[in-house]
Amino acid sequence: MKKIDFHIHTVATVSDHSFVFSMDTLKNYVADMGLECIAITNHNMFDLHQYNEIVKEIPITVFPGIEIDVEGSHLLLIGDGNELEDFSAKCKKIFMAIPTANDSITVEDLEGIFLDLTKYILIPHYQKNPEIKQATLNKLRANVTAGEVTSAKKFKYCIGDDDALVPVCFGDMRM
């Protein structure tokens, strides 16, 4: 079994509480948890320079990502690490479209910015606040890989429900 965490914050944004990034904290977290892969998913922004520094320092696969406020819920969008300049430019459009913690974009806005959602891993907050609304999930469902839950109990419940998204549970850590 692979150990991954696709929900790691390294930059405090308007949607976050204040914290200061520490490469040592990130290195220790990766080592202590025995992680084989991570994604950097800050709220509504992607810092290409910092991402490149993390890739140099962390001896595992690091994917670029972003946690986007979409229709009042959160969606992890993770890229493959190719075309980083293009990914960064798209994330800058997200950053400009969501200037405050109370703002969000529509699914149509998301599709207009990222164009081909099949190129990304999409993981909405599923049984986790702010939870994706059913109408939003219906629009994204064809491209959703899994749903993020908050606990082992919710994970187990989703595993037993044939209609539920495949559950994943990440750290949602601030480094």
Where are these regions (language model features)?
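Broad hydrophobic/π-residue packing in well-ordered secondary structure
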Residues: M1, I78-G81, R174
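An N-terminally biased module of ancient metal coordination in phosphate/nucleic-acid-related enzymes
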Residues: M1-G72
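Active-site environment of divalent metal-dependent phosphoester hydrolases
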Residues: V11-T13, I40-H49, D69-E71, K128-K133, ...
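Extended substrate/RNA-proximal surfaces in nucleic-acid metabolism proteins
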Residues: D47-E148
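Active-site neighborhood of phospho(di)ester-bond hydrolases with catalytic His/Asp-centered motifs
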Residues: I4-F6, C37-H43, F63-I66, L122-H125, ...
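A structural signal for short coil/turn segments at secondary-structure junctions
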Residues: M33, L117-T118, D162-D163
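Active-site-adjacent C-terminal substructures of enzyme catalytic domains
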Residues: K133-G171
